[in-house]
């Protein structure tokens, strides 16, 4: 009898954890199927925003305005077209030189380092970041600065061949993660994501899930925020050994990615592997095909390589 009650409680608690979206995982997969069929609609909305920004940039009357619009264009192209995002980071650098503004130069350099890191140019990204004098950085750039170091060292650790090198890169990742926690506002999305990441690294999966769910339940989150939160939730469930939780939150993350029209993402590819393992071959192929097409359009070479290896 006690065993039956325990199983019942476990099922109820699981339902509460997945209740925020009020959809079953199967319903989420069907939603993804529909979004993939019509994903050009979301791409058209993004292209319209980009066209408007380019028009504003062309009509700008000062370098300050041009710098701002180039920044917005960098943000729009981030995870959408990496070559274009790099072009606008370079334009920001040119304008910063012209205005002789050191903080603008540092911001542009970090934009370029971000793109380099995303495309696997880790050495070049670290060299560029190394040219920035941390002592002269304004407060508003510290979070971005530490975030880039943490992300790049984390990626280098993921792809390191030897255990010794992997351990060193992860040690550096830990250092910059702690630095990030010191500068991010405690109620910010960035702080919650980094803190949850730290909990996951230290096998405190339930605590990570708790804080992520608390933030996820906030109203008016944009798709990008939802994508990051739910992907991190999926990692917490994966490491707990809860495949259903992992699948559920990967599905939510994939939906948010597709709706925000980003092309450089991970969730849909990982979800494809899970549904493949369950024997849903056609759906897995469709998800991988979509992921490969988007990665190719984005010029996300690392993602293209990862997906090609699955094929």
Predicted segments with their positions:
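A "functional boundary" signal
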Residues: 5, 15-311
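Classical Sec-dependent N-terminal signal peptides that target proteins to the secretory pathway
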Residues: 9-10
């Amino acid at each position: 009898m006690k065993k039956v009650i325990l199983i019942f409680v476990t099922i109820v608690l699981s339902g509460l954890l997945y209740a925020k979206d009020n959809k079953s995982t199967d319903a989420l997969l069907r939603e993804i199927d529909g979004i993939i069929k019509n994903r050009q609609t979301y791409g058209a909305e993004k292209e319209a925003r980009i066209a408007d920004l380019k028009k504003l940039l062309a009509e700008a009357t000062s370098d300050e305005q041009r710098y701002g619009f180039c920044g917005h264009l960098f943000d729009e192209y981030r995870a959408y077209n990496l070559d274009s995002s790099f072009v606008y980071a370079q334009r920001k650098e040119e304008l910063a030189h012209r205005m002789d503004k050191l903080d603008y130069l540092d911001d542009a350099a970090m934009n370029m380092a971000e793109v380099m890191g995303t495309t696997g140019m880790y050495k070049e990204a670290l060299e560029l970041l190394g040219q920035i004098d941390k002592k002269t950085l304004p407060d508003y750039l510290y979070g971005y600065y530490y975030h880039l170091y943490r992300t790049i060292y984390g990626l280098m650790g993921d792809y390191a061949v030897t255990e010794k090198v992997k351990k060193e890169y992860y040690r550096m990742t830990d250092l910059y993660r702690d630095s990030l926690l010191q500068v991010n506002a405690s109620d910010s999305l960035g702080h919650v994501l980094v803190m949850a990441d730290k909990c996951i690294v230290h096998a405190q999966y339930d605590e990570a899930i708790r804080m992520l769910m608390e933030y996820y339940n906030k109203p008016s989150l944009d798709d990008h925020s939802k994508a990051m939160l739910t992907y991190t939730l999926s990692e917490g469930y994966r490491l707990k050994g809860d495949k259903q939780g992992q699948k559920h939150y990967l599905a939510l993350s994939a939906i948010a990615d597709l709706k925000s029209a980003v092309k450089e993402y991970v969730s849909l590819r990982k979800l494809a592997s899970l549904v493949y393992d369950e024997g849903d071959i056609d759906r897995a192929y469709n998800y991988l095909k979509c992921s490969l097409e988007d990665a190719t359009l984005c010029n996300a070479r690392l993602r293209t390589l990862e997906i090609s290896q699955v094929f």
